[in-house]
Amino acid sequence: MKDFIKKPPMGWNSWDCYGAGVTEDELLGNAEFMRDRLKQYGYQYVVCDIQWYEPAAKGNVYNNFADLCMDEYSRLIPAVNRFPSSANGAGFKPIADKIHSMGLKFGIHIMRGIPRQAVHRNTRIYGTTARARDIASQFSLCPWNTDMYGVDTEKRGAEEYYDSLFKLYASWGVDFVKVDDIANTEFSPQNPYSAEKEIELIRAAIDRSGRDMVLSLSPGPAPLN
């Protein structure tokens, strides 16, 4: 287990200005502003928030059951119409490289779990013969977004799925991952920590990825009783 960071990360998250619809030009424009105006005060993280894999995403209203950009191994990839440099399998690496060249760090947002689209198509998982349908927990749902099912951490292939995700992110040069919908799930309101086993797999996958990444957990709407 890696150490906790010494102080809260200082940076910018695209949700605050663009909701789910940020583009490559907007992301890099804000990175340039941070480099020129904020870096000297300790700001360093440029984070691309939710649904970078959704071609039609706009604002803060989600398109239910949208067609998502995904590779053959059930992993979401950037929408090329919004992030042109991600074409031909490049992923976020070109953007991360540009942000790193500014002396800054690059982060992404992900939703807990595996894409429902992958489950419906029963696509492969890298490093195992298990498929998406084998590891999905179809009663573990986010109440406000339809992109994902939870992962059944007891199933063969669950660990390999999360490992493959974070090895992909490491190859892109990701420094920070915000994982959302991490508190109670729709069918477990009585259990505010129903996603805790997925947190454990995510943390372990980061440690095995070969790259240091800050893990930031976002609960989503959660009861405080």
State where each predicted segment sits.
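Short helix-terminating capping/connector loops at secondary-structure junctions
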Residues: I5, K39-G42, S101, D207-R211
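Alpha-helix-loop-beta-strand connector modules within alpha/beta enzyme cores
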Residues: I95-I99, S194-M213
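Substrate-binding cleft/loops of secretory-pathway carbohydrate-active enzymes
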Residues: G220-N225
